[in-house]
Amino acid sequence: MFKDRKLLVTGGTGSIGNSICKYFNSNGCKEIYSTTTNLIKVKSDQDYIQFKELDLNNIEKLNLDELFDFEVDYLVLNAGLNKDNIFLRMSSDDWNSVINVNLNSSFHLLKHFTKKMVKKRFGRVVF
């Protein structure tokens, strides 16, 4: 089904991201990439995934062309940050971290990868 296709999943070390990667791998996906904030979190059964260590909280400061020098066919924006606190107690720094990881990083990755998807006239994005 996904033979000769490439996938990038943000948050691939979490339970949902890991399941997504496993599904694509078991269905013939050629190359699977994922982002993580800490390569130590990578599980031993994830050796088929090529991980990129990336701080999604500061993605606007990164050179995405250099970091992601490849195209993908499928982009799954799965990474998310939750600061367990009620809204009234949330600090501005916590709010900014949540927005940066959950929204701004997705915007920057979408902008980077969809240009290439449009050019080759194929691509799928899951948010």
Q: Where in this protein do the model-derived segments appear?
A:
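N-terminal Rossmann NAD(P)H-binding glycine-rich loop of SDR-like oxidoreductase domains
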Residues: 13, 17, 21
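Conserved glycine-rich Rossmann-like NAD(P)H-binding loop of the short-chain dehydrogenase/reductase
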Residues: 29-42
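Rossmann-fold cofactor-recognition segment
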Residues: 46-59
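Active-site loop of short-chain dehydrogenase/reductase
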Residues: 71-72, 117-127
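Conserved NAD(P)H cofactor-binding loop of Rossmann-fold oxidoreductase domains
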Residues: 78-84
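Substrate-binding pocket helix/loop in short-chain dehydrogenase/reductase
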Residues: 86-87, 94-99
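A short, exposed helix-loop element centered on a Lys and neighboring polar residues
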Residues: 110-111
